[in-house]
Amino acid sequence: LSHGEPVGENPSPGNKAGGISTLEDKALGCTQKCGKSYVEGVLPYGERLKVKGLNLLSAPGNDLVAATALASCGCHMVLFTTGRGTPFGTYVPTMKISTNSTLAKNKPGWIDFNAGVIVENEPMEKTCERFIDYISPGSKRRIRKQRKERLQRKLRSSRQE
């Protein structure tokens, strides 16, 4: 904003209705969704991903433009959270994740996964497990295998002590 660039309808009317008042608020909220991972890199628009881990992408915040920017840097799937819904998609598989069950119920053609059940008291762990199963059916087996290997390493190291 300090560079005088136009931001148009950003934050969007839906963002504003949800309590986001500035573009900085929106960016911080997006970064917060990444959890506690360290930022490994920042990609300019159109640059390919080179470093494993959490990378931030410097690109416009418009949904369609942002999804296209993600695809241009090598993204295989866009996980798009929404509280109001959007029918857009892009040439990379775009999964829309509802933050409320009303939206998921009213727009089943737009929403792929309902995460709104968390605020209806479904345990976060259960929702996460269902989500991982949904986006990658084989991932549950990989996670179980990784946990088993980690436990086996701990057991071996405790026996050596």
Where are these regions (language model features)?
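Anaerobic metallocofactor- and corrinoid-dependent redox/one-carbon enzyme cores
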Residues: 1-161
